[in-house]
Amino acid sequence: MPDKAASKKISLFFVLALLTAPVWPDVLIENVRVWDGTSDALTDTTSVLVRGNLIAATGMDLEAEGADRIDGQGRVLMPGLIDSHVHLTHAFVLGGVKALEASTWEEIAAGAVAAAHEMLMNGFTTVRDMGGMGTGIKRRIDEGLLVGPRIYSAGAYITQTSGHGDFRLRSQPNARWAGREMSNLERLNVMRIADGVPDMLAAVRENFAEGAAYIKIHAGGGVSSERDPLHVLQYTPQELKAANQAVRNWDTYWTVHAYDPKSINQALDAGAQCIDHAQLIDEKTMKRLVKEGIFLSSNLAAMSEDLFRHPLYGNTASPVHVKARAYVNRSSEFADLVRKHQPKYVFNSDIVFSTRSFYRQHMDYEKYVAGKWFGNLFALKGLTSRGGELAAMTGQHNPYPDKLGVIEQGALADLLLVDGNPLEDLSAIGAHSGWFDAPERDADIKSIRLIMKDGQIYKNTL
């Protein structure tokens, strides 16, 4: 027989839990023109009602008894921004991969917390962390203990031995062959070296076990790493197909780090649904991306000659400099191919190994280049609705299943209120034409007057 006294205690516990759960009033944002994340024009003056963490309604004459009211004073209300390629654990590590390997977990975590706060103050209410970070900080942000964007985490890098994500120092042999302990970054689950089908399956499943929303695999050579030349094709078709099967079993997707046609096409043949970088792509492969509906996540500022003003890439004695020079020289056709074929581009900042000041300059310049090369509307969609579409590719494994990157009924209430019209001038969201020569600024962007994430206001300077 059930214990009636115990049942009453349990019932009382749940009632008290409901009574003490955080409750905040509805918010009615009035007198605004809305850019909804997809349209090519602003609405006429209207209102948006937020209830809980969702957009409840849009339009004039909304019923909102008891709601907190915000007068937008004719400003533009738009979706919160989405950065589809960040590395929060690497953002404020100075000195590159070697410095990261030498870092303690406290140093890495502290940098990631600072980077998360920085992203939210830059208007990014959602980020896709592309490797090197688990879900601990994500969970603490979701719980309200830390301030930052919602995070879609890929978990640890998955890399082959001597792949782009193999961040071991030259003095550190492979633990498997040497019978020694793993490197610091392996031990901290920043990277996983996986060779062969069994290792690949185990690495994918381990990332999911630790909370990854999707999987990121290094499928080709990189610039910032020292063990792999830029031209190298990484992993075999069998290994990538095994990863694809493991990922699909979780009803989510996987993306790859890949620059050139051979690495991109091998990944697509195996089932990848997103390509990150791709700056060395050819026209035939670009057409394939468009035909198959593949997402393209590309960082643009890195194709500039200004890249060599960065201390890591400008050091002519470094092997990283040699690879960066080859990369910049060979990426000249990329922008023309994107303009011509209009792939499913999402915004990608990929800012690593920087100071706070440089982080802000780089982010502002990345926004500017996206608009300059592709037009403001194309860039803004990549920063909002298209980023939301990519987030939704996580399917039943989506940690935030409501719609992102748009202003419509039922979507998550991630909103920015800005001075100016971003469709005409991206400086409304902080874009700046200078990179290293840009003036230093504070953490927040002055033209972004209000930042709301998940229905809660994190900045209001009205």
Positions of the model-derived regions?
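C-terminal cap of metal-dependent C-N hydrolases
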Residues: V32, H397, K403, I407-L462
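Histidine-rich, glycine-flanked metal-binding segment
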Residues: T38-M78
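Metal-associated gating/positioning segment near the N- to mid-region
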Residues: R75-E143, T161-R168, Q238, A270
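Histidine/acidic-residue-rich catalytic or RNA/ligand-binding cores of hydrolases
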Residues: F92-G95, R139, S225-E226, I264-A270, ...
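Histidine/acidic-residue-rich, glycine-tolerant segments that coordinate divalent metal ions
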Residues: M133, D142-Q266
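Active-site core of metal-dependent hydrolases
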Residues: A154, T161, I217-E333, V346-S354, ...
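His/Asp/Glu-enriched, well-ordered alpha-helical/loop segment
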Residues: N249, R330-P422
